[in-house]
Amino acid sequence: MLMTGSVGDGSEFDWEDQKTFISRDGGLTWRFVHNSSGLYATGDLGNIIVYIPYDPEEDGDFQSEFYYSLDQGRTWNEYELTNAISSVHPYKLINPTPDGSGSKFIFKGTFATTDSETNSITSLKGVEYIIDFSAAFDSRTCEEEDFEDWDLADGKCVNGAKYKYRRRKQDAQCLVKKAFKDLSLDETPCNSCGESDYECSFEFVRDANGLCIPDYNLIAFSNICDKSKDKSVLVEPLQLIKGDECKTPMKIEPVDIPCDEIPEEGSSDREIVTTENKFDFEIKFYQYFDTVADESLVMLNSIGDAYISHDGGQTIKRFDTNGEKIVEVVFNPYFNSSAYLFGSKGNIFSTHDRGHSFMIAKLPEARQLGMPLDFSAKAQDTFIYYGGKNCESILSPECHAVAYLTKDGGETFTEMLDNAIHCEFAGTLFEYPSNEEMVMCQVKKKSSETRSLVSSIDFFQGDNKIIFENIIGYLSTGGYIIVAVPHEDNELRAYVTIDGTEFAEAKFPYGQDVSKQEAFTILGSEKGSIFLHLATNLESGHDFGNLLKSNSNGTSFVTLEHAVNRNTFGYVDFEKVQGLEGIIITNIVSNREKVGENKEDEQLKTKITFNDGSDWNFLKPPKKDSEGKKFPCDSVSLDKCSLHLHGYTERKDIRDTYSSGSALGMMFGVGNVGDKLLPYEECSTFLTTDGGETWTEVKKGPHQWEYGDHGGVLVLVPENAETDSISYSTDFGKTWKDYKFCGDKVLVKDIITVPRDSALRFLLFGEAKNMGSGSFRTYTIDFRNIFERQCEFDITGKKRADFKYSPLGSRTGCLFGHQTEFLRKTDEKCFIGNIPLSEFSRNVKNCSCTRQDFECDYNFYKASDGTCKLVKGLSSANGADICKKEPDLIEYYDSSGYRKIPLSTCKGGLKLDAHLAPHPCPGKEKAFREKYSINTGAYALVFVTILLVIFFAAWFVYDRGIRRNGGFSRFEEIRLGDDGLIENNRTDRVVNIIVRLGLCISLITKSAFQRTKAGVARFSSKLRARFGNRKGPTYSSLLQGQFSDESDGLHEDANDLSSFTSQDSNFEIEQEDAYRPEQEHTSQIDQPATSNIPDALPARSAIHKPDSTAVRNEDE
């Protein structure tokens, strides 16, 4: 067999990496043939093999060649086509003998003719060769002694028999020269049957130890109990593989299956199948491979035994390590089929096919330190391992960490950097890296108390650049690397880079609650912003701080919310809803002043934002609980009565998030309705299906939850309580059913499914108290059979309407500058499967910008009236800083107080971030003046030209229409329609029309003036007659600054929204249909109104419109 392929797990394919291999034992073993791909053909029953590379220049010369072997692929010879045209590209290679027994081959290819002067291709031509091997070995024909017997599978039994085949010896110097005949295999049945000759009977499946155990779902299908009148039946768990030829069967003990444990016909839950597996030791670690190929996962128990399952835990096999215990399991975050198991004896077991196969390699001779691996985001086999060198003991003076690099998946390691404790392949993380080979490492020498940050572009073979001499630590997120650097007075500073070379200090906003930057937590990044929590109170057990958000390059932060809860370990009650833009849930400390003074314990309240942190609201509570009763609090104010949820800081497993990336809009949470968050055990379980807009209490008491089939199956199990049942819903939480999954009550510690939440199988980890051996158990609950069919996916809507596009909740308007609809299932009787619904959302339309598309800029805060005002005593960001970052700029702008939310795609409409007047960058004053200076010479020329045209036209009309007709002295004598004017041609007539028109306008103006003057005189006379007894005139003064406002300046507090409206659009804030979530503090600007100006601001009309009464008094 000759094949083209590559060595790997099959997850990647690249034609440039394809090589050619050969096997002469039916594919059992393979040998390398050539470092390229090409055409191949065989002759003389496989004794002649011809191979031609697709690229004739792969060997470095232009001469075309082919390769051949006469010893069944052991050795190869090159034959150059010396008389041929160079660079012939093959497209066909065949043995013209139909059965492949001939010794001649036909090779067809193409070559290009080029122009000798321009070296360009002028035409393509075909060429054909006949390759003849009939004279090989001096035309000697093989005899009987040139043949041998070949045993299939190295003589092992295959399907109960051994097989032999007669073929030419590999080193025989002859050709067979016989026509092909059907294979005549010498078959010898094996005497005794072995385990390899058997498979599980239909009613059984294999468990973790490879034993066949009853599957009651299959038993129900087989109807074996219906054929028996007894309460139980005996069934052999093994059956001989069909077609197996072994003679003596194994003795198989039948299994007694109780028929009363089989679900009866008509049971509502008969299609739900539960598979139980028992363990003597607790399962401490478990994780799925994040793929759609199957439901593979790795589990590790408390004594270091590893288990593999490929069907969601139904069948579990113990991983054979030859007695070596597994101390750690690490998954590759960039390549979802790869994982690494570290053995206690220094071996590393790696898989790149989700645990179907493993490769074993030896770790470097170093002590395992338990530090996580660091992987390359672009090379699957490249990662960094950290080991301890000179470590007889961790406390040894010479013991230190060493970073080891592997580029072949762990088969070989090279020592990369001493004292490195954390490295990252920075060049693979940035969108636009300065060098793709860049590696950054944090170095901690044992003799020093400080840590430094270094980088290299050759894995520290020669290049070693120190970036920071002293750091606290660093991490990467979403295309950024953030470094925490100590500062004077026990403060911290954060530096950010987006290319690995240029670092800029992150500017945090200052306020009354931020006195020092002592601790911060990076919460992640998404679409051009970093979310960060800056601690403002570090009292143990009473920690909280401000939630910040950066601009696109991560250097300028603004405050989104104050007093956001954190714990002593730096974890924060902050969670972005998966799959939906801009929805974040946080818990705030509502009594932060008294907590800061140690007078009260923390009182937490839950808030949500629908526009990426610009506006926050309390959660709307449901009207009734799961029993149909009203909640104790019914205040209209959400500040006094809202829903509160326990957050990230209290989770046992950080993977248990509120939401799911595939069940769009759905979130579970444990909480309560009231004025503050109650203790966990006093709370209930709530569900939302519209992204947090509305909530429903689904179960009393705390529950664990899991999503399946993109939210088509929802499962709840009681938390911290023994149970034998789960609750599930197949209609998105509208109704719930209970299902009993085991006979004895167990304490369920966790419920999981595949990371994409698309499977119909759920895996529960439980512990049965007082059960002795086998008290630790897993239960795989399979919902695959409860649906009638799989949903038909057709986004065109021409077929069955199992899906439709719809908005999320009531938000039918614009959000982040666009209106989005999501694809959702309409028929509850079908299941979705692996269809990636989250990838099929669509933007219905783009929208004009409104106030909701902007957030406050650096050192600005959002006031109660919805405007952004400058923090008292602070200044806006120095716009000139951008000149340092971009040396080619010649100008910069001051901040308007607003900046556009990075998620927003709006166009036109409100322009709150519009630039003010430009300023020259330092040192670019001359270029600035040249750009904006007026060209006086050009303007003077235009002005003079216009004056000359006007003067010439006036002189022409005067000369031809006035002077020639008697001059100005006759002007008053001319009447309209007078024929006394001279008109000798068309020009005279046009000039006279202009003269008459001027006369008409002059007379009308004069008459209007005289009438107005007479009317004013009469009115004045009447006033004097009526008020003549007054002592004298009175006046009313209007002071210049009477109605001015200190906040009227745009640069200082940016509070006049109307001045930003686009000149070419009539869009207004109140006229937008965009969704506006209810505000905690309602402001005029966020409500429908008839005015463009917030109530808190002075009306512009009152400033610029004169008071009619005042004017009238002044005219007296």
Curated annotation (Swiss-Prot):
Keyword Transmembrane helix: yes
Ribonucleoprotein keyword on record: no
Gene Ontology BP term (one): Golgi to endosome transport
GO CC field: cytosol; endoplasmic reticulum; Golgi apparatus; membrane
S-S pairs: none
Transmembrane parts of this sequence: 934-957
SMART domains, sorted: VPS10 (SM00602)
BNR repeats: 21-32, 67-78, 307-318, 404-415, 607-618, 686-697, 727-738
Polar residues biased stretches: 1084-1093
Chain spans, region Disordered: 1069-1116
Pfam families assigned: Sortilin-Vps10, Sortilin_C
Membrane protein topology class: Single-pass membrane protein
Annotated localization: Membrane
Alphabetized UniProt keyword annotations: Glycoprotein, Membrane, Repeat, Transmembrane, Transmembrane helix
Bias kind Basic and acidic residues: ranges: 1073-1083
Glycosylation, residue list: 35, 336, 553, 846, 985
Protein name (Swiss-Prot/TrEMBL): Uncharacterized membrane glycoprotein YNR065C
Gene source species: Saccharomyces cerevisiae (strain ATCC 204508 / S288c)
